[in-house]
C-alpha cells in the first residue's frame, strides 16, 4: 500500500518566464521495519518565451527554451526488510527465508535533467522541438553471497549507477493550398545507456568486507550455453550480449572440416561481446493529406541498429524444416573455405534442438515499416441539418514490412516479464496486420 501527498506550484512573469515546482512524499508499506519511513522527491522546471522577451527575425514567430530537474523515487521489492517463509515450487514446502533482513533500505531514485527548444517559423508553417536529457538511476538492489553460518544465503546491497542520455527531435510542417492541406511530422530519437557502477566499493552488510563486483551475469536469452548472454560490466551498456561458442577453426582462422565433412563447435570460458539489443536510433514520419472532407493518413516508422536472436530459426535449421536449410540442400550444401559442406551436417552443428548457437543466429534488428494507413471522410454537415459532424473511416496497421533482415519481427518480445527478451524469438506468433473501421459523431 502506498499513501502519498503531492503539491505543485506554478508562477509566471509577463508571459515570458514560467516556473513550475512539484513535490511528492510517499509512505510505502514495503518500508516497514526500515529506518526510513517515507521518501520525498521533487521537481523544478523553468521556461522562457524568447519571442516575448526579444525582437527576433521575422522568420521566427515563436521561440521558447526550457529546462527541468526531476527526482523520481520508487520502492524496492516487498519483504526485503521483513522476509517471510519462502515457497519451494519443487518440494511444495514452505522454507525458512534465505535473504538476510535489512533495516536500512532506501528507495531507488532516478535523478534526471533535460533542456529543450521549441521554435515556430514561417508564419507557423514549420515547427521544431528539440530535447536533450540525462538521467542516473541509483540505489538499485542486488544480492550478494554471505556465510551460511549467519542462517541466510544472501544479503541485499543497494548500489549501482546506470546513466541514460539521449536526444529527441521533431520537425513539423502544416499548410493549405486552395482547399488542399498537408501536415507532416518527422521524429528522431536516440538513447545511450551506460553502467557507471555496479556494486564495487560497497560493503557486505554481514561480513563488513568490501565487495568487488564490476561484472554481473544477468542471464541467458534462451538455452544455457547456446543462446547469447547478457552481461553487465562497468562502462558497458545494460543490453550488451556475449557469445561463448563458434565453429572450430585452425591456426589460420579457417573453419576445420574433417575428411568426413564434419564440423565442430569450440566453447570458450571467456565470452566475446558481439553487440547489444538497443537500437542506434528510431525514426518516425507521419503525414496527413486533406481535401474537401477527405483525410488520408500515412505513418512510417524505422528502427535502426541493435541485434536480434532467433532460437526458432536454429531449431528449424537443426531439424531441416526451414526455408534456409531447404535452399542449402538445393544448392548442394554450404560453402566453407574453398569447398562445400553437407547442409545437414552444417545445420546440425550450429543449430540444436533447443535453439541455435548465438553467433550464427544473431541478426540485425533494423526494420522499416508502413506502420499505419488511414482514410477518413467527413460527411457534409448540411446532411444533418448542421447539428452534427459525422466521420467515417477505415484504418490498417502494420501493413507492410518494407525492410527487415531478421527472420521475425524484431519489435516483438518473447516475454513480458523481462526487458532482456526484446528482440528474441522463440516460436512466437507472427506479428499481426490489423484492419478496422470507425464512425465518429460530434454534436
What are the language-model segments listed below?
Residues 1-6, 86-128, 155-177, 276-282, ...:
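Outer-membrane beta-barrel signature, preferentially recognizing the C-terminal barrel domain
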Residues 1-18, 69, 81, 100, ...:
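Outer-membrane beta-barrel transmembrane domain signature of Gram-negative proteins
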Residues 16, 51-63, 122-125, 176-182, ...:
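Short loop/turn motifs that connect adjacent beta-strands in outer-membrane beta-barrel proteins
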Residues 23-29, 50-52, 69-75, 132-138, ...:
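Transmembrane beta-strands of outer-membrane beta-barrel pores
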Residues 28, 303-397:
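Extracytoplasmic gating/loop element in the C-terminal half of outer-membrane beta-barrel translocons
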Residues 55-109, 127-162:
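Solvent-exposed loop/turn elements at secondary-structure boundaries
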Residues 95, 159-164, 208-242, 331-334, ...:
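C-terminal beta-signal and terminal closure region of outer-membrane beta-barrel proteins
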Residues 157, 174-277, 404-407:
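Conserved small-residue
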Amino acid at each position: 500500500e502506498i499513501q502519498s501527498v503531492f503539491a505543485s506550484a506554478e508562477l509566471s512573469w509577463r508571459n515570458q518566464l514560467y516556473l513550475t515546482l512539484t513535490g511528492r512524499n510517499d509512505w510505502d508499506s514495503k518500508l516497514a521495519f526500515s529506518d526510513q519511513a517515507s521518501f520525498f522527491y521533487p521537481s523544478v522546471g523553468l521556461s522562457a518565451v524568447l519571442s516575448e522577451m526579444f525582437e527576433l527575425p521575422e522568420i521566427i514567430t515563436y521561440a521558447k527554451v526550457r529546462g527541468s530537474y526531476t527526482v523520481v523515487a520508487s520502492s524496492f521489492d516487498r519483504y526485503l526488510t521483513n522476509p517471510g517463509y519462502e515457497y519451494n515450487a519443487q518440494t511444495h514446502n514452505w522454507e525458512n527465508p534465505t535473504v538476510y533482513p535489512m533495516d536500512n533500505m532506501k528507495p531507488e531514485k532516478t535523478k534526471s535533467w533535460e533542456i529543450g527548444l521549441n521554435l515556430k517559423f514561417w508564419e507557423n508553417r514549420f515547427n521544431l522541438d528539440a530535447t536533450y536529457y540525462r538521467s542516473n538511476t541509483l540505489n538499485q538492489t542486488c544480492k550478494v553471497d554471505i556465510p551460511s553460518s549467519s542462517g541466510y544465503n544472501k544479503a541485499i546491497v543497494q548500489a549501482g549507477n546506470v546513466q541514460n542520455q539521449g536526444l529527441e527531435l521533431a520537425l513539423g510542417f502544416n499548410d493549405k493550398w486552395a482547399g488542399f492541406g498537408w501536415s507532416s511530422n518527422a521524429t528522431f530519437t536516440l538513447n545511450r545507456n551506460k553502467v557507471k557502477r555496479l556494486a564495487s566499493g560497497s560493503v557486505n552488510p554481514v561480513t563488513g568486507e568490501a565487495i568487488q563486483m564490476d561484472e554481473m551475469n544477468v542471464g541467458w536469452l534462451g538455452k544455457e550455453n547456446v543462446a547469447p548472454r547478457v552481461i553487465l560490466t562497468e562502462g558497458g551498456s545494460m543490453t550488451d550480449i556475449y557469445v561463448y561458442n563458434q565453429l572450430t577453426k585452425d591456426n589460420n582462422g579457417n573453419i576445420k572440416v574433417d575428411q568426413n565433412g564434419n564440423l565442430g563447435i569450440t566453447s570458450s570460458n571467456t565470452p566475446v561481446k558481439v553487440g547489444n539489443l538497443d537500437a542506434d536510433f528510431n525514426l518516425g514520419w507521419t503525414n496527413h493529406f486533406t481535401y474537401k472532407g477527405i483525410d488520408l493518413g500515412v505513418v512510417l516508422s524505422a528502427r535502426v541498429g541493435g541485434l536480434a536472436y532467433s532460437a526458432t530459426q536454429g531449431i528449424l535449421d537443426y531439424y531441416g524444416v526451414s526455408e534456409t536449410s531447404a535452399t542449402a540442400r538445393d544448392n548442394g550444401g554450404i560453402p566453407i573455405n574453398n569447398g562445400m559442406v553437407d547442409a545437414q551436417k552444417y545445420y546440425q552443428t550450429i543449430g540444436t534442438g533447443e535453439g541455435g548457437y548465438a553467433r550464427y543466429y544473431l541478426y540485425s534488428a533494423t526494420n522499416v515499416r508502413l506502420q499505419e494507413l488511414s482514410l477518413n471522410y467527413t460527411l457534409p454537415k448540411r446532411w444533418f441539418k448542421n447539428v452534427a459532424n459525422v466521420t467515417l473511416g477505415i484504418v490498417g496497421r502494420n501493413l507492410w514490412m518494407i525492410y527487415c533482415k531478421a527472420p521475425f519481427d524484431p519489435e516483438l518480445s518473447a516475454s513480458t516479464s523481462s526487458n532482456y527478451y526484446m528482440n528474441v524469438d522463440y516460436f512466437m506468433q507472427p506479428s499481426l496486420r490489423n484492419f478496422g473501421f470507425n464512425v465518429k459523431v460530434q454534436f
